[in-house]
């Protein structure tokens, strides 16, 4: 069994491999770490049996593959304690990371 793709999924897949091999010791599992797109491409073209992605599958990938979630993770935005803001809305995070705003004072208006 060849598994390929996301570097952030790889540690979880290594643990799943260990558990699987305990009950199926005669199976060979190779995990190839790269990125989500490479994993999906490999699954589509048949160079791997399982592709790993740490993002939602693209529509074009879903035409060829079936996605199965094995885990969810959280992402935090952290600011310095000197920052005047005590919290950020999802919309504020969006405008920061899209470059629509470039100063903290824009967030306090």
Residue ranges and their predicted role:
Residues 1-109:
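Flexible loop/hinge segments at secondary-structure junctions
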């Amino acid at each position: 069994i060849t598994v390929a793709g996301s570097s952030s999924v790889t540690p979880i897949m290594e643990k799943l491999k260990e558990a699987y091999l305990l009950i199926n010791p005669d199976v060979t599992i190779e995990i190839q770490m790269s990125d989500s797109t490479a994993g999906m491409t490999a699954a589509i073209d048949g160079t791997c049996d399982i592709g790993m992605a740490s993002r939602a599958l693209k529509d074009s990938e879903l035409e060829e593959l079936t996605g199965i979630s094995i885990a969810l993770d959280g992402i935090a935005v952290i600011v310095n304690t000197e920052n005047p803001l005590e919290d950020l809305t999802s919309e504020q995070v969006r405008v920061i990371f899209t470059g629509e705003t470039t100063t903290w004072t824009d967030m306090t208006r």
